């Protein structure tokens, strides 16, 4: 996940990370502390105050969604190349790319070099966003021609929904909320589980726990 710095921050401890307003940081872990994230900038990593940054979620980033749930979602897509990026279940801090091709869903480990650059094969990138954009026109596979395409959205997707009930996450990658909360819908291509953002967090939530609202909040 990427974030943009809203203010300058000067580290005051060895495990903190300094940055300037406007810097794009790679957030490595959002669960270290209630007020601090672990992030990386220019090959260095450390802790940063969460209120100094603004998260920049991409519609293709699904966080800690389990591999099985990724396969379930992508198998319902109609076109090859439909994809998502998720946090690796087996290697915390790493990422996996899941892509639909034919009747299968293929998974690629997103590798990183010593400088923190991302890659699948040879070409390296400063961010996941750059990697995704490159593989929209260059195959992610060496065995088939698979080009990344955004997950198909259902037409007239509601921008916001409101929670009808409290929901406490049962698995990694799910989004918790309280009754009455407004949730920004990021993907509703699955009939049962939608992706959304609430209180600065993103994740999956059950469709039958919410109701559409006809205004922005």
Curated annotation (Swiss-Prot):
Keywords of this entry: Acetylation, Cytoplasm, Endosome, Golgi apparatus, Host-virus interaction, Isopeptide bond, Nucleus, Phosphoprotein, Repeat, SH2 domain, SH3 domain, Ubl conjugation
InterPro entries: Grb2-like (IPR043539), GRB2_C_SH3 (IPR035643), GRB2_N_SH3 (IPR035641), SH2 (IPR000980), SH2_dom_sf (IPR036860), SH3-like_dom_sf (IPR036028), SH3_domain (IPR001452)
Post-translation changes: Phosphorylation of Tyr-209 in the C-terminal SH3 domain reduces its binding to SOS1.
Disulfide partners: none
Pfam families, per database record: SH2, SH3_1
Domain SH2 per the UniProt entry, residue ranges: 60-152
Record note on what altering residue 49 to L does: Ineffective in DNA synthesis. Abolishes interaction with SHB. Abolishes interaction with SOS1
Phosphothreonine: residues carrying this PTM: 211
GO biological process: actin cytoskeleton organization; B cell receptor signaling pathway; branching involved in labyrinthine layer morphogenesis; cellular response to ionizing radiation; endodermal cell differentiation; epidermal growth factor receptor signaling pathway; fibroblast growth factor receptor signaling pathway; insulin receptor signaling pathway
Documented effect of changing residue 89 to K: No effect on the interaction with SOS1
Cross-link (Glycyl lysine isopeptide (Lys-Gly) (interchain with G-Cter in ubiquitin)): 109
Domain SH3: 1-58, 156-215
Domain of life of the source: Eukaryota
Effect on the protein upon substituting residue 193 to F: Loss of binding to AGO2
Recorded GO CC terms: cell cortex; cell-cell junction; centrosome; COP9 signalosome; cytoplasm; cytosol; endosome; extracellular exosome
GO molecular function, one term: protein phosphatase binding
Subcellular location: Nucleus; Cytoplasm; Endosome; Golgi apparatus
Family per similarity comment: Belongs to the GRB2/sem-5/DRK family.
Protein's job: Non-enzymatic adapter protein that plays a pivotal role in precisely regulated signaling cascades from cell surface receptors to cellular responses, including signaling transduction and gene expression. Thus, participates in many biological processes including regulation of innate and adaptive immunity, autophagy, DNA repair or necroptosis. Controls signaling complexes at the T-cell antigen receptor to facilitate the activation, differentiation, and function of T-cells.
Domain notes: The SH3 domains mediate interaction with RALGPS1 and SHB.
Name of the molecule in the record: Growth factor receptor-bound protein 2
Organism: Homo sapiens
The encoding gene: GRB2
